[in-house]
Amino acid sequence: MTTAPAEHGRATAVPRLAPAAVFLQGLADQDFATVGGALAADAHLRALLPKGLREWSGAEAIGGQFAHWFGDTEDFELVEATAGQVGGRLQLRWRLRLRAGRLGAGWFTVEQQAYADADASGRLVRLDLVCTGYRPEVGDGRRHD
């Protein structure tokens, strides 16, 4: 995972990225309790998915949704993750490769990008996310749109 401190490298930028780092590490480890633990109890997720806009409220519901998306896999790999700041908001991006029977045969890649706000306790309270959906990897004989 890479992080890009804001404020031109000032030491104060790193603690602001800590909530993003905890969230991304939980995701990398497929530890959805840690993902949920990075969120405030009243957190809200708004996600633009291939099937449309969806919303979830509460750390438990949001953590459960990430478990639904990225749990129950035969193989799982965090390819890339970054965290930074844009206009005072946290910016998180991750790309995953996974194989899961529920998706069909072969490897799939998915990338998500989120902008988030943290509360004074360092937990994420709001995430606005966009997702590519599960994309079959090139060379697996499938048609790609």
Model regions: which residues?
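Short, low-complexity N-terminal intrinsically disordered segments enriched in polar/charged residues
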Residues: 1-41, 144-145
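Soluble or luminal CAZymes and related metallo-dependent hydrolases
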Residues: 15, 19, 61, 108
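Hydrophobic alpha-helical core bundles mediating ligand binding, dimerization, or RNAP-core interactions
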Residues: 20, 27, 39, 62, ...
